[in-house]
Amino acid sequence: MGSPNSLFEVESFLKNMFNDPLILGIKNTFARKMLASFITHSRVEETKKNYQAIGGKSPLTAHTLNLTNKLNELDCKRFYTYAMRYTPPFAYQVLEDIKTQGIQSVVLFSLYPQFSYSTIASSLIDAKAALQKLAFTPTLYEISSYHTHPDYISCIIERIKESLGADNPNEFVLLLSAHSLPQSRIDEGDPYQKQCEENKEVIQKALESEGIVFKKIALAYQSKVGRMKWIGPSTKETITKYKKHKMIIFPLSFTLDNSETEYELKILYASLAKELNVPQYRVCSCFNDNERFAKSIMNILEEHLRGKAEV
């Protein structure tokens, strides 16, 4: 979806995000722009402070670039690049470059493992609109969900084991923290929450198959905005609930570190854990340009192309 590459991009990032009809769910363009402007104005300074706390920008773009570089190193058969939804590089710019190169087959691969209309569908619509504007008609494939794929799950298990080290898992609560969504989106049929729950079950089985049994594996949701009801329980509530236990946090809905992992999990909720005297609070890093994750993308891609027709 993108993140600000500097404090100067924070305002435009927020405007672009809240003006997306799949984010606010308002079809009337004028009304949506007015509300997006109001929300942006009310949040921009606080958001800038959050980014200042992690160095003045999101690490997302750098991690994404490093991942695509890793993929290009590992797979000489294809050209890997990336586009963002709300900050540069936008889909139009990237697809224009791909068209110029004479590439005739394009795979749209989401770096969100679980499907949601607010994130993945929005990005796919944006990319297809760009293709139409460019009069570019490549053979098109899309990979929009892989939350239970064994290669992806193995990357998660590796990160959890790294965080656990030689310690006894039975002394820890494993908290899988996913980005939240408004409850109304789930009620309308968005499969995101169901896929997060499926993701949790597969992770638990994979850990148990290796003899790794945590005191508790909990699923919670972070990053709520506004007053409407969002899916829960919240990450804050769950940390508070298990405050007497050692805790490992895994960022379930992110494959690349960003403000939600670097600020919310590693600063905001780490501070909460300290206030609550949580015995140990550890946050797993996202995969970023980890070679195992890059190879899992390649494997998922290969399997998809062997078994699926074009869009």
Curated annotation (Swiss-Prot):
Q: What name does this protein carry? A: Ferrochelatase
One GO molecular function term of this record is: metal ion binding
- The EC number(s) given in the record are 4.98.1.1
Coiled-coil region(s): none
Q: Which reaction does it catalyse?
A: heme b + 2 H(+) = protoporphyrin IX + Fe(2+)
Q: Which gene specifies this protein's sequence?
A: hemH
The enzyme class is lyase
A GO CC annotation recorded here is: cytoplasm
One of its GO biological process terms is: heme biosynthetic process
- Pathway(s) where this gene product acts: Porphyrin-containing compound metabolism; protoheme biosynthesis; protoheme from protoporphyrin-IX: step 1/1
Q: Does the keyword Ribosomal protein apply?
A: no
Q: Which residues bind Fe cation?
A: H179, E260
Summarizing the function annotation, the protein's role is: Catalyzes the ferrous insertion into protoporphyrin IX.
The Swiss-Prot or TrEMBL record describes its family as follows:
Belongs to the ferrochelatase family.
Q: What single Pfam family name could you report for this chain, choosing any that match?
A: Ferrochelatase
Its primary localisation, in coarse terms, equals cytoplasm
Q: Where in the cell is it found?
A: Cytoplasm
> Which controlled-vocabulary keywords does the entry list?
Cytoplasm, Heme biosynthesis, Iron, Lyase, Metal-binding, Porphyrin biosynthesis
